[in-house]
Amino acid sequence: MEEFQRYLELDRSQQHYFLYPLIFQEYIYALAHNHGLTRSILLENSGYDNKSSLLIVKRLITRLYQQNHLIVSANDSNQNQFFGCNKNLYYQMISEGFAVILEIPFSIQLMSSLERKGIVKSHNLRSIHSIFPFLEDPFSHLNSALDILIPYPVHLEILVQTLRYRVKDVSSLHLLRLFLYEDPNSNNLITPKKAGSSFSKTNQRFFFFLYNSHVCEYESIFVFLRNQSSHLRSTSFGDLLERIYFYGKIEYLVEVLAKAFQANLWLFKDPFMHYVRYQGKSILASKGTSFLMNKWKYYFVNFWQCYFYLWSKPGRVYINQLSNHSLDLLGYLSSVRLNPSMVRSQMLEKAFIIDNAMKKFDAIVPIIPLIGSLAKAKFCNVLGHPISKAFWTDLSDSDIIDRFGRICRSLSHYHSGSSQKKSLYRIKYILRLSCARTLARKHKSTVRAFLKRLGSELLQEFFTSEEQILSLTFPRVSYTSRRLYRRRIWYLDIICINDFANHE
């Protein structure tokens, strides 16, 4: 117990983060809007436009704190004017900068943690595809998995309390409360329509930060208890998740379970346990029996309710057998399938045929949901029959072909880890014929005429495969690249899920 108490010692030197003065620094808003920097696909903003000057920010915060400007009627909640502009525009502008400021202490601690562990290329860990190699080898030896829907906080104040001991100055916390209670999109953090994907695109950075800090709160204690019960310590869990606010809860757990600590931690001693989180969900896979998985199920429900005030129910945690169930994971259908093989053995004059079945992690493209996404975007109907893209008929021919080609290459790149890439040919066919129908509609001609006129160009644009990309990247090993193309390839440059692959 003394070892646990030493681990729970508060590091007072890390509590003194005074972030409020940074709100008035103009370069913070330039960073938030990626002004002068490379734009991020995930955090794409409308532009800087000199709207974040120091004078405007000071005046705006002063006006926001005045009570008469915080009382907004239901009829003009979206049209309340500050300085002749829309109120929500200013909330968005400052909250984006505020999100950058809140990330500073966590980023500093994360970088120091990665340096201690000797992880040089930490940006590779941001890739969505890095999840699949983590699962590929262990899942072939596991039996069951918990498919968990992560509960959301029941009150916005819980989000503020999560950051209370990390962000020391009270002014920053008051401003955070102001953003949460005044922003109409903040309700998505409590009652989301779609788990992890319902945040407004105008303020994603702010809400993603709050959501991740909320989820990491319980994950930090979960991994701490797991590490104390196993000699095989977790190496992929960074110090970023160890918030000062969590220590009080951990101390309470240690105090309650002091007399029978080891007896209560038997559940964590499964050496074959793997946990991964994505899109408001998490997966806990284990080699344990159905009885053990049911114990895990009720443990999570009680853990959330008793210690983190998160209402949940057993129906949000599903127990699935990996041998006969596929996991809908980041645009892939992942499962563990049996790969049968036959071995002929010769002993003296007798021959034996031995049937052997090996488990293999498999990830395929869910073709039906993908066609549904294309139908929603008006590239085809619900049956997968290509239709013209009417909104693009005002563009030039080269722009139309380029747009369809980029979508096709993006899908091929994202689904490069699929073991059945031939299913992507149907998607390429839909996009190619939709492009031809769009061009034919623009020029008031027939599809046959355009396919005859631009057939070779369309083929070159839509069937640039990953094999060709690999041969350009590794020109001296073209044969090896062709072999690699037939296998799964996980890339380390994919930081957000493809829009068409997001079926949540």
UniProtKB/Swiss-Prot annotation:
Annotated protein name in UniProt: Maturase K
Stretches assigned to coiled coil: none
Pfam families in UniProt: Intron_maturas2, MatK_N
Its biological purpose: Usually encoded in the trnK tRNA gene intron. Probably assists in splicing its own and other chloroplast group II introns.
InterPro entries: Domain_X, Maturase_MatK, Maturase_MatK_N
One GO-annotated biological process of the protein: mRNA processing
GO cellular component: chloroplast
Annotated compartments: Plastid, Chloroplast
